[in-house]
């Protein structure tokens, strides 16, 4: 039986296992999808050694960047993004070749593009991790100017305390790429001047549990258009399946 899986830590919030195993059952596919909750990225080698029939795996927090040093090849797009969330395991003469891809960027682009209007020209990206890199790549490919927001001073980013109402008016697309507000921390949300938002504001939260985060709820209160990350997650899962089945 073929195996697929997900590496990350922690994985209590994982959607992929249920999605893929339901797909396999419904379509009569002889395969299973397993969560590999590994406390360090070095444990990936043990996962590979103990699962010789592993055909591919997804990568989530906090390993989308760290996994890259373990790969034999990486697509040019994933290298440009600087993060990998899909790995194809190619078996060759009793060994394996690991190839890294990024499906987050295309999935996010397909999800947010229908929401954009001509007046959406600048975006704030909350967070600096692997997911934020894919979001940045996608938004720039759509012609938007972007800037990352961080809790800490980092080159090329701004800190939350510098986001004034006038910044919110100018950067009217805001994407949360942090775990702030994720289950079980329902009451948490990024500290922003939500009162400056209006009907021209888009709030996109990569979180999908809960369905409506406090970030989204606060924006809706002032007329913002909001969306969670479920559609993006579904799209990247479909893209992952295509990659693993030689449709890349």
Placement of each model-derived feature along the sequence:
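Phosphate/diphosphate ligand-binding glycine-rich loop within oxidoreductases
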Residues: 2-115
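Glycine-rich adenosine-cofactor-binding loop
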Residues: 8, 102-105, 112, 116, ...
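Short phosphate-binding/catalytic loops that engage adenosine nucleotides
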Residues: 29, 143-144, 224
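Conserved beta-strand positions in the Rossmann-like core of class I SAM-dependent methyltransferases
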Residues: 34, 124, 147
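Active-site capping/gating segments
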Residues: 110-111, 224-248
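NAD(P)-binding Rossmann-fold cofactor-contacting core
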Residues: 141-159
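Rossmann-like adenosine-cofactor binding region
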Residues: 156-227
């Amino acid at each position: 039986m073929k195996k697929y899986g997900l590496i990350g830590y922690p994985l209590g919030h994982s959607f992929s296992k249920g999605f893929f195993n339901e797909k396999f059952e419904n379509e009569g596919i002889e395969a299973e999808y397993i969560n590999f909750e590994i406390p360090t990225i070095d444990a990936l080698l043990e996962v590979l050694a103990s699962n010789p029939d592993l055909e591919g795996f997804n990568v989530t927090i906090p390993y989308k960047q760290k996994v890259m040093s373990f790969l034999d090849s990486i697509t040019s797009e994933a290298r440009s993004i600087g993060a990998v969330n899909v790995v194809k395991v190619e078996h060759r003469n009793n060994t394996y070749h690991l190839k890294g891809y990024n499906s987050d960027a295309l999935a996010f682009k397909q999800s947010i593009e229908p929401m954009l209007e001509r007046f959406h020209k600048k975006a704030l990206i909350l967070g600096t991790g692997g997911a934020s890199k894919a979001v940045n790549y996608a938004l720039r490919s759509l012609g938007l100017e972007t800037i990352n927001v961080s809790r800490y001073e980092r080159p090329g980013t701004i800190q939350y305390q510098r986001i004034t109402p006038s910044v919110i008016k100018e950067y009217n697309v805001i994407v949360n790429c942090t775990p702030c507000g994720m289950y079980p921390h329902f009451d948490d949300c990024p500290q922003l001047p939500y009162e400056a938002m209006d009907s021209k504001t888009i709030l996109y939260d990569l979180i999908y549990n809960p369905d409506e985060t406090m970030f989204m709820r606060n924006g809706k209160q002032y007329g913002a258009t909001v969306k969670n990350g479920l559609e993006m997650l579904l799209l990247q899962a479909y893209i992952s399946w295509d990659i693993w089945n030689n449709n890349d």
